[in-house]
UniProtKB/Swiss-Prot annotation:
Pathway the protein acts in: Cofactor biosynthesis; thiamine diphosphate biosynthesis
Protein name listed in UniProt: Phosphomethylpyrimidine synthase
Catalytic reactions of this protein: 5-amino-1-(5-phospho-beta-D-ribosyl)imidazole + S-adenosyl-L-methionine = 4-amino-2-methyl-5-(phosphooxymethyl)pyrimidine + CO + 5'-deoxyadenosine + formate + L-methionine + 3 H(+)
GO terms (BP aspect): thiamine biosynthetic process; thiamine diphosphate biosynthetic process
Source lineage: Bacteria, Pseudomonadati, Pseudomonadota, Gammaproteobacteria, Pseudomonadales
Subunit structure: Homodimer.
UniProt keywords, alphabetically: 4Fe-4S, Iron, Iron-sulfur, Lyase, Metal-binding, S-adenosyl-L-methionine, Thiamine biosynthesis, Zinc
Record-listed Zn(2+) binding positions: H431, H495
Sites where the protein binds substrate: N233, M262, Y291, H327, S347, R348, G349, D388, G389, L390, R391, E427, Y454
Amino acid sequence: MSTTLKNAAHLSESAQVDSGSVQPFTRSQKIYVQGSRPDIRVPMREITLDVTPTDFGGEINAPVTVYDTSGPYTDPNVIIDVRKGLADVRSPWIDSRNDTERLAGLSSNFGQQRLSDAELTALRFAHVRNPRRANAGANVSQMHYARQGIITAEMEYVAIRENMKLQEARAAGLRTQQNAGHSFGASIPKEITAEFVREEIARGRAIIPANINHVELEPMIIGRNFLVKINGNIGNSALGSSIEEEVAKLTWGIRWGSDTVMDLSTGKHIHETREWIIRNSPVPIGTVPIYQALEKVGGAAEDLTWELFRDTLIEQAEQGVDYFTIHAGVLLRYVPLTAKRVTGIVSRGGSIMAKWCLAHHQENFLYTHFEDICEIMKAYDVSFSLGDGLRPGSIADANDAAQFGELETLGELTKIAWKHDVQTMIEGPGHVPMQLIKENMDKQLECCDEAPFYTLGPLTTDIAPGYDHITSGIGAAMIGWFGCAMLCYVTPKEHLGLPNKDDVKTGIITYKIAAHAADLAKGHPGAQIRDNALSKARFEFRWEDQFNLGLDPDTARSYHDETLPKDSAKVAHFCSMCGPKFCSMKITQEVREYAANQRIEAVDVDVAKGLAEQAERFKQEGSQLYKKV
């Protein structure tokens, strides 16, 4: 039910964390890897494995370390209170750079109005800090520091995070061999160092979305030479969902692996909802500011102004939004190119700006004021996510003149943003059939000079409403392999309705599979360790390890237990699919045991000799496949 002022209890008193989001994973523990200073503590999840059964040699299996986006929520040593928000992680790092000031209060007009409205007290997050801003004339972006040759704490943090204790895994004897990858020109090193991170950010090939007002953030990096990331969307609408439900979706989404979260709220109380989300988020938060700006003018796109939009940017930057989707590439001359499309303009932001351009017959004010926007971005270190407002909404419209015209403009805007040392990534489609996906990636790399690409799927067919997490997961895996840096998840409810918690989880797991498959295909160092460990556990019938090493242990365990629920089945050398007599892995073990007992190694020599004799006889008789008898 939607939160209203009439029935809302004081959220600052009543709000509770989602119980499912704070449960530790079975046989896992939160570990922290310390950096060069005591306050750089990088979280990871360590999965403890059982000893190999004596039938298979009785080997001790080292724990497996995996990337963890769940923040403090899965650390049993941390007391979670969503009413107070998460602990401050970054303030000491920001203070040490001595280039920001603490403001006396909010500087946006809208923010001040909301704060002074007593009727909103019931909904308001109670522990709001005064915002920071760059000192006059200063630039506080990670790109600016990188281009000055400075390795920030955030850069060191993400380097440690990306490596996931790879050296220790090798030393512990984990199977680290992996198939050779094909990276399509990416420059993936054998080890991620802080200096490599700095170089990639300075070059514009990677970004660390990290607003100076999002001090609860655990930094992460987005770029084609790093692990492929995924984004999950949340947000209320005019038709439903409360603030507490959106915070629950946030914590639930990051539990299952969402690297960033976009708040796409379009209903009431957008400002208050966003404050609760950011204060409780350990991952970067993105928004589409034009959505809130449109709410401020009652939904009339033609009434939007630069002044109102500017105030919205400042309002959100002071709350701590880490990246903004800005549809500055929707130019007046591109709008007619969409007229003959099957599905026209499907981006909400794109359609808003197209309507404004036509109503005023003027150029998009986001384009004409782009350098003004850059000034705001670098004062708070908000990253650009340059929106693809003309993305195709059906495979029939893929790779058309409107889409690629806008992409070329986004490349132009990227260079302007880089001139201001503002971190930038590029949004992409959409609906694209498989044979056209690589062209999208190649053109983006060319137009945008390798700025990180961030795509919605793409969906590879339009015939599967209710299953678009699958149609898009196919495209996501492909474009991730080709070089896309972040994949925006799609849930089963895409095109159908607002997703619930189960839909969020399904979308995230689907996209974690796609991202991981892309990492394997690119040959990212250490990407196959988890696969190898799970395969070994499967062959040795270590059922609990199979469950716990998977992306979704709960579902794997429940599927197994549907037919074999007893604890004794957890040590059985078969599952219900094949049963005890037809398990291929059990049969393989029996063959190995027989070979060992019968000294098959010696027999192999005789077999090879016999095969060689038969081959020579075949040649001597004329190499004829068939003979008359």
